[in-house]
A protein has these predicted regions:
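Extended recognition/assembly regions associated with phosphoester-bond processing machinery
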Residues: 1-487
Length: 487
C-alpha cells in the first residue's frame, strides 16, 4: 500500500475520524497538570478497595453461608464457625524491599529481579486484613486457590488455639455485570438524540491484537515490520491470509512496542559519559538512537488509515512507569499522528482518531464488544506470587476479584488514587487480553449471571511472529504467523 503523505491539516477531518464501531473510554486517564499529586499515602488504596468491594463480597457470601458473619477480622472467636471479609496480604521473604531501592540509589549492586516471590520451602504466610488488623490464614483450600496481595475475599472457618484462622472455603466477588453488545454506542445515540446508524448488521470483520514488537532499530526489525505491515494489509501470504487481512477492522498493539531501554550505567560509565563530548538539549546526542521510534512511526504510517490502530504503552515504552500508564506522546510519531485526533478537538466530544494512543490498562468498545486489557504487567506480577504457570487462570482470577492490578501498589507501581480506584472492574468485558505473555493462549470463562468472557494471552511478536485475530461476531480466536526465514 502507499503511505499517506502530508500534514494533518491537508486531510479532510472526516477521514481522520475512527470508524463508528469504536469507542475508547477514559477509565484510566490520570488528572492533568497540577491536579496530579504523588504525596498521598498508598495505604489508602487498599482501604478504598475494601470499602468498594466489601458489600459485593458480603452479599455473595451471605447467600452461601447465611448467619455466620463477623464484622471485623479480629472479632473471630476460637472454636466458633464464622466468616469474614478482608484484603489478602502475602508475607513473602523474597518480595522486593525498600532497601533494594536504596541500594540502587547509592550505586550498590541490587539483587537481580526474581522470577517468583514464593519461596521453595513454603515459608510464606497468607493473611487477611481490614481496618481492625490482620489475621493469619491456614488450611488446605489455600493451596487450591490463587491468592495474591490486594485480592478481596470472604473466608469461612474457625480460629485454632494458635490464633490462626483455619479456612474451610473462600468466596470472591465473581464477575460483575456484563454490558450488552453495542451498549455504549446505543447510549451515545440516545443521549445525542441521533438516530442509530445501521452498524449492527453482521460485518464478518476481524480485530487484530499484537504485543511485544520490541523494536530496537536493527535491520532485522525493519524487515520484520515490513513483513507484518504487508501481511496486515493483505499484500503478503496466500489467498487465505489475504482474505483474513481484508477483514481486519482494527489493530490493537498491547505494549512493549519498543525494545527495553539501556540498563542503568555503572559509576565508571557515567563518569566517562560526563568527560565525553558536549550535550545538546540535556542529553548526549552521540548516544541517542532515534531509529526505534522512527521505525515504529513508519510502520504505523504504512498501515494507516487502511487499518485503524489502538496503541497501548508497555513496560519498555517511553511512558510513565506506574500503572495506569498514560498514552504515548504524539510527538514520538510525527507521521502517524496525522491520523490522530487533532489537539483542537481534545476538549470536544469528537471521538478518537484513526490512530488512537491510549492508556495501559485500556477499556473500550470495538465492534460493539467491550474490550479490557493491558500490556501484561499486572498478570506478570501476579505470576510471581503463585506456583502455577497458567497465565489464563491468573487472568480469570483477576476478573473474579474485580481488580485489574491487585498487587498494586505492593509490588507493582501505581498512581496513589484517593477518592476512587479505577483499577477495580465495574463492567465485565467481553474480551479480556494481556500482552507480552510467554505464549499464546485463549479460554472462555462464564459468570454466575451468564457472563461470557474470552481470555487472550498475547505472545511477544518479536519472539513468535504471531498475530491474534478475534472474529467480530462470534469472538472466535485464531492466530496467523509472520515468519522471517533466515538463509
Amino acid at each position: 500500500m502507499t503511505a499517506v503523505e502530508g500534514s494533518g491539516d491537508n486531510i479532510p477531518a472526516a477521514s481522520r475520524e475512527a470508524p463508528p464501531a469504536y469507542t475508547s473510554l477514559s477509565t484510566f486517564e490520570l488528572p492533568k497538570g497540577e491536579d496530579r499529586h504523588y504525596v498521598q499515602q498508598y495505604a489508602d488504596m487498599y482501604f478504598l478497595r475494601l470499602v468498594q468491594l466489601k458489600p459485593v463480597v458480603e452479599q455473595v457470601a451471605a447467600e452461601a453461608w447465611e448467619n455466620y458473619q463477623v464484622e471485623r477480622v479480629l472479632d473471630v472467636r476460637q472454636g466458633e464457625l464464622c466468616w469474614v471479609v478482608g484484603t489478602i496480604y502475602m508475607e513473602m521473604p523474597l518480595k522486593p524491599k525498600v532497601l533494594d531501592d536504596i541500594s540502587k540509589e547509592h550505586w550498590i549492586s541490587a539483587p537481580p529481579p526474581r522470577e517468583k516471590y514464593i519461596s521453595p520451602d513454603g515459608t510464606h504466610e497468607t493473611m487477611i486484613e481490614d481496618e481492625s488488623g490482620r489475621l493469619r490464614l491456614t488450611g488446605r483450600c489455600l493451596k487450591d486457590q490463587i491468592l495474591v496481595t490486594g485480592a478481596i475475599i470472604a473466608a469461612i472457618g474457625t480460629e485454632n488455639s494458635d490464633g490462626v484462622f483455619e479456612v474451610a472455603d473462600i468466596i470472591v466477588a465473581d464477575l460483575p455485570r456484563q454490558p450488552a453488545r453495542w451498549e455504549l454506542e446505543d447510549s451515545a445515540s440516545a443521549v445525542s438524540g441521533k438516530s442509530k446508524k445501521d452498524t449492527h448488521k453482521p460485518s464478518g470483520n476481524k480485530i487484530a491484537l499484537i504485543s511485544g514488537l520490541q523494536i530496537s532499530g536493527s535491520a532485522t526489525d525493519l524487515l520484520q515490520l515490513n513483513l507484518l505491515a504487508e501481511t496486515l494489509c493483505g499484500e503478503l501470504g496466500g489467498p487465505e491470509v489475504a482474505a483474513k487481512a481484508a477483514t481486519i477492522s482494527r489493530l490493537i498493539i498491547a505494549g512493549d512496542s519498543l525494545a527495553d531501554a539501556c540498563p542503568i550505567p555503572s559509576r565508571e560509565e557515567l563518569a566517562a559519559t560526563k568527560r565525553g563530548g558536549s550535550k545538546k538539549y540535556g542529553y548526549d546526542a552521540s548516544s541517542y538512537n532515534a531509529a526505534p521510534t522512527d521505525h515504529l512511526d513508519a510502520f504505523l504510517e504504512s498501515i494507516l488509515p487502511t487499518i485503524p490502530v489502538t496503541l497501548l504503552p508497555g513496560q519498555t515504552d517511553p511512558a510513565n512507569v506506574q500503572i495506569p500508564q498514560q498514552p504515548l506522546h504524539p510527538a514520538l510519531f510525527p507521521k502517524a499522528r496525522t491520523w490522530a485526533r487533532s489537539p483542537a478537538k481534545q476538549a470536544e466530544d469528537a471521538g478518537p482518531g484513526t490512530f488512537d494512543p491510549v492508556t495501559n490498562p485500556w477499556e473500550g468498545e470495538v465492534e460493539g464488544w467491550r474490550f479490557l486489557g493491558s500490556g501484561g504487567q499486572p498478570v506478570s506480577d501476579v505470576f510471581k506470587y503463585v506456583e502455577s504457570d497458567d497465565r489464563l487462570e491468573m487472568m480469570a482470577s483477576m476478573l473474579r476479584w474485580r481488580c485489574n492490578a491487585p498487587t498494586a501498589p505492593d509490588t507493582l507501581w501505581c498512581y496513589p488514587f484517593q477518592d476512587d480506584d479505577p483499577l477495580l472492574i465495574t463492567d465485565c468485558p467481553h474480551v479480556y487480553f494481556a500482552g507480552n505473555q510467554p505464549a499464546f493462549g485463549t479460554r472462555i470463562i462464564e459468570g454466575p449471571a451468564g457472563q461470557e468472557v474470552v481470555l487472550i494471552a498475547l505472545p511477544r511478536f518479536k519472539e513468535t511472529g504471531q498475530v491474534v485475530l478475534v472474529d467480530s461476531e462470534t469472538r472466535e480466536v485464531e492466530v496467523i504467523e509472520v515468519e522471517l526465514v533466515e538463509k
